[in-house]
Amino acid sequence: MVRSFPSDGWSALPTRFGFWPENPTTAGVVSSRVFSARLPEVCRQVHDKQPFGMFKGENGMNYTFSTFLIEAILIIFFIKIVYVLLRPLRQPRIVCEIIGGMMIGPSMLGRNRNFNYYLFPPIANYICANIGLMGFFYFFFLTAAKTDVAEIFKAPRKHKYIAAVSVLVPIACVGSTGAALKHKMDIRLQKPSSIGGVTFALGFTSFPVIYTVLRDMNLLNSEIGKFAMSVTLLGDMVGVYVLVLFEAMAQADGGGGAYSVIWFLISAAIMAACLLLVVKRSFEWIVAKTPEGGLVNQNYIVNILMGVLVSCFLTDMFGMAIAVGPIWLGLVVPHGPPLGSTLAIRSETFVNEFLMPFSFALVGQKTNVNLISKETWPKQISPLIYMSIVGFVTKFVSSTGAALFFKVPTRDSLTLGLMMNLRGQIDILLYLHWIDKQMVGLPGYSVMVLYAIVVTGVTAPLISFLYDPTRPYRSSKRRTIQHTPQNTETGLVLAVTDHDTFSGLITFLDFAYPTKTSPFSVFAIQLVELEGRAQPLFIAHDKKREEEYEEEEEPAERMGSRRVDQVQSAFKLYQEKRSECVTMHAYTAHASKHNMYQNICELALTKKTAFILLPYQKERLQDAALTELRDSGMLSVNADVLAHTPCSVCIYYEKGRLKNAMVRSSMDPQHTTNSSHMRQEMYRFVVLFLGGADNREALHLADRMTENPFINLTVIRFLAHNHEGEDEREKKLDDGVVTWFWVKNESNARVSYKEVVVKNGAETLAAIQAMNVNDYDLWITGRREGINPKILEGLSTWSEDHQLGVIGDTVAGSVFASEGSVLVVQQQVRNQMGGDGFLNGKFDYKKLVSPWSHSHN
């Protein structure tokens, strides 16, 4: 169907191909009249051939296809330019896209007749408009396909109450305002269905909008982000059906009477039943037929994407909002792998980067700020503005007030109130739908688009200012290895991505020598990239609920969980073998790579661990240049953890003799705490002590290893010539720790200590290279804090990876030619402000429980 929207004060417009006449009869022109006699006619000139080229004297811009290509280039270009310009102002992508679309419309460049004449003639605009509508449909389908509807039933009661208050109060207030202003409204806006539609749009906050904005702001995995998505998802499930009721009212207002309303509701019910009973089961059959770990067959994906168009056709034919079909279809798609993730992988980039720009071009073409005038203000614009202001204020006050009532921290409550007012894609399409149903005119539509831009453009930076998801992770309390009392339990977070990384980190833990008197409490978290679902998922594996969870798990979720079974089995096996000296707590976090650090830091904060152990997974490709590197994805996670950690951090790069070594106990029978034994051979470890807090932390960790009878430890301390560049305070702290270490291990024949005096970084590097590097199985060093800059002078420019620090990167590099593994330590950076409450936005973890945190296993 060719959609053409009414235009106030429309008159025939001249184009290259003639006019848009009231009754076109010109030969060679095809006319299509849509909707009603008062609407403009869409005229298309027939071309029976393509241009031979500019060198033949022809103008390619006279042909529809050439014009369409230029339009596509300009649309995408303008949107990208606006995004680049506004991104430093912390504007979400949706705001940039709407403004980019407006640039080609009558509000900006479209005011120029030559611009329209050559670049955006009506003959090509109608093609762009239909592609734009398809972009909206597929966007809503993919977003709905990522949504786990089952989370609604698992949401805490508090979330349900807040969702109800944040929806009912604005609806009541906006509806009352609309009723009071009814006598001042335009005849189209006076209809009950029109007032109800506007009230509904201002009362509800759509889940796709919250999801996309929070994704742009990297807040999906934050506590308040999960909270907001839970609340909006609850409201959306009600809102979809309320929208159908308003559509039924519109059927009655359109003159169809009760007969058309009844058939409308019957059609909607039949479609919903078919989706639940037929389509959903077909999707489950596809999931069951897909091999474990594989992608869904391409033929199924094509058929599903074609089904989106079928759902659009049916809902449009029934008279419903055309977006309802894709949303309903997406909701019955099993989220996550394999089907949801395959749909996202195969189509998301094309939809977001190519189709959606046409969607915003459609929005921009219909937005005309020049129609906001004294003539249109009283009846078309002012009622919408008053209702919008009432909706914003009541939405903010009701959401914030309800959150405060349930003891949500003040800063988080204010942030939630702002999030509930965000506007985006589904709101814009709803405004277009109002024009289609003649609920508002173009002036009213333009005002609502500007309202969406202003509200989202202002609230998004305010959210960034009010809510910093990393702020709570900094602790004022000491959480380090150095300050953990001896002969007490040491807590640590173990972050793994697969079985290989787990094996390497466990090997290191055994070298760290947990015993009955000095055990480890390990919080092992497996990181899984979020695929095919919108909501992050954090699972705490509780043995008591293992059977219950497996029975409740959905088929699609079982398919997705098979990939983590191997790691979870390894967690369980290690716990059984080391039960006397290690307590293992297993978790799984499904999140995007940008947000994984939040799961790690939050776990370390709540469990009060002394350090976090991370794998270093950057390896050089075989037979490739030294600059060619493979990044497994953990590098960005490691960098974020180092920047926001609430405790100390250890990064372990396993290679050489320790790589894939079997974990067996090498402990003295008096200290044996399990039945697994490390290889009966001696290992040589070396600590490169350059001074500073990080190196002091590294030395304390190495001290734990001295208890292991199969480890020889060498400590080499580097000192600056004539004490140049030394910080007196750091020097005293270093002397104290080194003295303590030497006194404690003076009688230990497996521990040796050396001092090396150097003048600059070159001598430091030469001293390290002078060592027999292949004699050492593990190099231990601090990352950077407090190191005398004189010792590293000239080395910083050669460092490729700052995660490992200058020395760590040097000994880990291929140029150094060492086969030893590397351990780099960063001591906790304390939060000097300290305290909890409003100023630092401290989370209330016990009260603010995410609906995506489930206990099982």
Swiss-Prot record:
Keywords linked to the UniProt accession: Antiport, Ion transport, Membrane, Phosphoprotein, Potassium, Potassium transport, Transmembrane, Transmembrane helix, Transport
Family annotation (Gene3D superfamilies): 1.20.1530.20
Transmembrane segments: 65-85, 93-110, 122-142, 161-181, 194-214, 227-247, 259-279, 313-333, 385-405, 413-435, 447-467
Matches recorded under Pfam families: CHX17_2nd, Na_H_Exchanger
An example Gene Ontology molecular-function term: antiporter activity
Family, per entry: Belongs to the monovalent cation:proton antiporter 2 (CPA2) transporter (TC 2.A.37) family. CHX (TC 2.A.37.4) subfamily.
Protein name in the entry: Cation/H(+) antiporter 25
Gene: CHX25
